[in-house]
Amino acid sequence: MNIQLICETENSQNFTALCKEKGLTHDPASVLALVQTETDGEVRLELRKLDEPKLGAVYVDFVAGTMAHRRKFGGGRGEAIAKAVGVKGNELPSVIDATAGLGRDAFVLASIGCRVRLVERHPVVYLLLQDGLRRAYADPEIGEMMQKNMQLLPVHHITELNPFEDFADVVYLDPMYPHKQKSALVKKEMRVFQYLVGADSDSNLLLEPALKLAKKRVVVKRPDYAEFLAEKAPQFSRETKNHRFDIYSVNV
């Protein structure tokens, strides 16, 4: 993939090696840039849309900001995603998040106590997520929990996983879906992210391998206006204000 690769820190060797490993090539004409920068003494990776600097940078931060607030003051076990994957009482299902993205839904589940393995196929998003996890693992408050409950797998698609060895209670899918125009502008950060990733044109191909990996259920997060994934009706759905969780039970 071609993208601008910019290093604003003194040590560029690690950044160069990471980009090479993921097949990223510097393209000075690209409006997107993956940047290694340093803020308050901490090195991190950011995604920037250079022609729209007001949109700000996209980076993964599980330690502070929105995610820290959600961990401390969010709904916890009462959150819709927790109910959708089957968190109940002492039951904390193991989860494969097969479309990990920036890791936010996985973080909610990990904070509750679920063990979540993440799969992300886009090389830039993979590096952003890997970088966010690296910093979270080193945090004195949540580092131990994160190392135990959130693991980024060295694969890029769930078809690379072996159903006889790499199964989980739940496989979670949240494929990118074309947003309605008014909702696409709600979060500036999402505009940058969607410009990079676009819609998952082959997302319908995720359901069958997900069903093979799941021991109990597959949970698919969809906008409330979206059709069922792969045009396959779920056993039931949980609805929220703007989304729904379609739930496909295994062995029913």
UniProtKB/Swiss-Prot annotation:
Physiological role: Specifically methylates the guanosine in position 1516 of 16S rRNA.
InterPro entries: 16SrRNA_methylTrfase_J, SAM-dependent_MTases_sf
Principal localisation: cytoplasm
Native organism: Mannheimia succiniciproducens (strain KCTC 0769BP / MBEL55E)
Gene Ontology MF term list: rRNA (guanine-N2-)-methyltransferase activity
Protein name (database record): Ribosomal RNA small subunit methyltransferase J
Keyword set, alphabetical order: Cytoplasm, Methyltransferase, rRNA processing, S-adenosyl-L-methionine, Transferase
Matches recorded under PANTHER family: RIBOSOMAL RNA SMALL SUBUNIT METHYLTRANSFERASE J
Cellular component aspect of the GO annotation: cytoplasm
Similarity section: Belongs to the methyltransferase superfamily. RsmJ family.
